[in-house]
Amino acid sequence: MNNREKEILAILRRNPLIQQNEIADMLQISRSRVAAHIMDLMRKGRIKGKGYILTEQEYCVVVGTINMDIRGMADIRYPQSASHPGTIHCSAGGVGRNIAHNLALLGRDVHLLSVIGDDFYGEMLLEETRRAGVNVSGCVRLHGQSTSTYLAIANRDDQTVLAINDTHLLEQLTPQLLNGSRDLLRHAGVVLADCNLTAEALEWVFTLADEIPMFVDTVSEFKAGKIKHWLAHIHTLKPTLPELEILWGQAITSDADRNTAVNALHQQGVQQLFVYLPDESVYCSEKDGEQFLLTAPAHTTVDSFGADDGFMAGLVYSFLEGYSFRDSARFAVACAAISRASGSLNNPTLSADNALSLVPMV
């Protein structure tokens, strides 16, 4: 929101029945300008309708994966097909769940739509996600099914050498199941989907959220192709270089190729692109706007696993808060840096204040 919109919201909070001409007199602007600002506030979801009923905080709906993450780190650099000493860690995970968890840490109202099995993992995931502050009433428990699981093996340098993602359960998150949350989704300030969803579920989300800003996490180059025909519906996209190649349809061998690919996606309708690079820097591009590279701030790094989920949560948060494009990018990079400073997928010290304290370093 801009300063004028904030002034109008403050007036409406004090007197929801005030007339537009009275607001105009108070702010010394024309009534038509007041009407235009109010229309903008309604489009942004800050005002629900006549009588100026205010939405105190827009909420986000995340549609995506919730799964158990099992991560093993071998004590050697090149693990072979044998048993190796090392450490194994289990935690709540899933791209959608992790982003929702981070949004809750940042103080946003967030709902998660997903599916779990009726096993121990499913119960543990629901409880931990609920404790984090995420509304999980839209997570459906499927009887006789096993909860999705992600298994990753890393070497002693914390480089993932093998990962297996068993998310077959998500195939049962059908439009029929999702229909129970259609009203919740229709009134969201932002909808975020991850590409673990089936093509049918993605179609349901894109169709129902046609008038709502859509954020998409491509997840991997194996799943990014699912959204190639939905680019015109996407507001914000965060691909890696391999994922960008899939969406563009050509190899990227230089910065010039990357820029051309980004512009091609803009031409197809994507408003904001944040290309996550191997060195943790981010190439940021706004349609008909700025293009720049941001590097990660100097900050403690314990584990990079999950930092991109912190980044995406930062993008959603800053969009809902009305940040500029550049400030949104800087805030998201700061969130990613805080995420890397913990061995946990969701750093419990992540907060809006802590991220803002790092922004000047970005």
Model-derived segments and spans:
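Conserved beta-alpha-beta core of the PfkB/ribokinase-like small-molecule kinase fold
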Residues: 190-260, 280-282
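Conserved N-terminal subdomain of the carbohydrate kinase-like
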Residues: 56-57, 78-86, 105-189, 355-362
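Active-site nucleophile and cofactor-binding loops and adjacent substrate-binding regions
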Residues: 87-95, 140-144, 305
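Acidic-glycine-rich active-site phosphate/pyrophosphate-binding loop
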Residues: 66-80, 127, 283-293
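Conserved phosphate-binding/catalytic region of the ribokinase-like
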Residues: 1-20, 26-27, 32, 36-55, ...
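Glycine-rich phosphate/adenosyl-contacting loop at the front of the ribokinase-like
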Residues: 3-4, 8-13, 18-26, 30-113, ...
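Short gly/ser/thr-rich secondary-structure transition/capping motifs
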Residues: 43-45, 171-176, 216-222
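Short, conserved phosphate/pyrophosphate- and ester-handling motifs at nucleotide-, phospho-/glycolipid
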Residues: 103, 240, 308
